[in-house]
UniProtKB/Swiss-Prot annotation:
Protein name: NAD-dependent protein deacylase 2
Annotated organism of origin: Corynebacterium efficiens (strain DSM 44549 / YS-314 / AJ 12310 / JCM 11189 / NBRC 100395)
Domain notes from UniProt: 2 residues (Tyr-69 and Arg-72) present in a large hydrophobic pocket are probably involved in substrate specificity. They are important for desuccinylation activity, but dispensable for deacetylation activity.
Entry keyword annotation includes Zinc: yes
Reaction catalysed by this enzyme: N(6)-acetyl-L-lysyl-[protein] + NAD(+) + H2O = 2''-O-acetyl-ADP-D-ribose + nicotinamide + L-lysyl-[protein]; N(6)-succinyl-L-lysyl-[protein] + NAD(+) + H2O = 2''-O-succinyl-ADP-D-ribose + nicotinamide + L-lysyl-[protein]
Function field: NAD-dependent lysine deacetylase and desuccinylase that specifically removes acetyl and succinyl groups on target proteins. Modulates the activities of several proteins which are inactive in their acylated form.
Main location: cytoplasm
Stored PANTHER family: NAD-DEPENDENT PROTEIN DEACYLASE SIRTUIN-5, MITOCHONDRIAL-RELATED (PTHR11085:SF10)
Binding-site list for Zn(2+): 131, 134, 157, 160
Length: 254
């Protein structure tokens, strides 16, 4: 984006009071966590999503999936929030805005660890667990494998004895109703939407920014490459989260 367009985008952002930040896997890429759909390095280039992210696979044999998600949780805990995460949290705490809300498709906890307090997880979390049958929550013991392992037996529910599952949304499952309702409301109330690090191809999550677009709300996209959401963006910056977000907020004088 040329300098004139950058200054226009900054002027629009400077007048906003209620910010909605919509993030995807690219948000955490600068923290060393893999994205999902990169053909060479993405998560789904290395494992079959139907084997590691479906309720049918869990019902057949939960041990490989439990091992994989426990290892991923450990990797996420080793990662550190990057400058993009930290900038969002800093923006939230500034006196120039009324609110900075985050709606994320990510299942890590880097937004929270950076200091953001208003975070909605559309696809669940690596750090939340529940019984696969009765849904009773299970408290994470923080015991993560240091290296990938092929199988781990999941713990059993203290109430009904069935396996405890990761609190993430698998393919074919509905998004959590409460989180979806919050995300919809925030998109309808925002006066600026900032899209960061998402390909915009995973639905229904990708439909959320359209709600703001239909109201004429300015949308700023920060992502290294053009995406399916670029068409509705008022301004698109070709930058990573760790580059683009600090540059934006620095220009705002926050």
């Amino acid at each position: 984006m040329d300098e004139h367009s950058i200054m226009q985008a900054v002027a629009v952002a400077r007048g906003a009071r209620n910010i909605e930040v919509f993030t995807g896997a690219g948000m955490s890429a600068d923290s060393g966590l893999e994205t999902y759909r990169d053909p060479e390095t993405g998560v789904w280039s290395k494992v079959d999503p139907q084997a590691m992210a479906s309720i049918d696979a869990w019902a057949r044999d939960p041990e490989p999936m439990w091992a994989w998600y426990r290892w991923r949780a450990g990797q996420a805990m080793k990662a550190r929030p990057n400058a993009g995460h930290e900038t969002i949290a800093y923006w939230e705490g500034s006196h120039l805005v009324d609110a900075v809300h985050v709606t994320t498709q990510n299942i890590d906890n880097l937004h929270e660890r950076a200091g953001s307090t208003e975070v909605t997880h559309l696809h669940g979390s690596l750090f939340e667990f529940r019984c696969s049958i009765c849904s009773k929550p299970w408290r994470d013991d923080g015991d993560y494998p240091r290296e990938p392992v092929e199988r781990l037996a999941p713990p059993t529910c203290s109430l009904c004895g069935n396996p405890v599952r990761p609190g993430v949304v698998w393919f074919g499952e509905a998004l959590p109703q409460e989180e979806w309702a919050v995300a919809e409301r925030r998109m309808r109330e925002a006066d600026l939407v900032v899209i960061v690090g998402t390909s915009g191809i995973v639905y229904p999550a990708a439909s959320l920014p359209v709600l703001a677009h239909q109201r004429g709300v300015p949308i700023l996209e920060i992502t290294p490459k053009e995406t399916d959401l670029s068409r509705i963006a008022t301004y698109s910056w070709r930058a990573t989260a760790a580059e683009g977000l600090p540059a934006l907020v620095r220009r705002l004088g926050v």
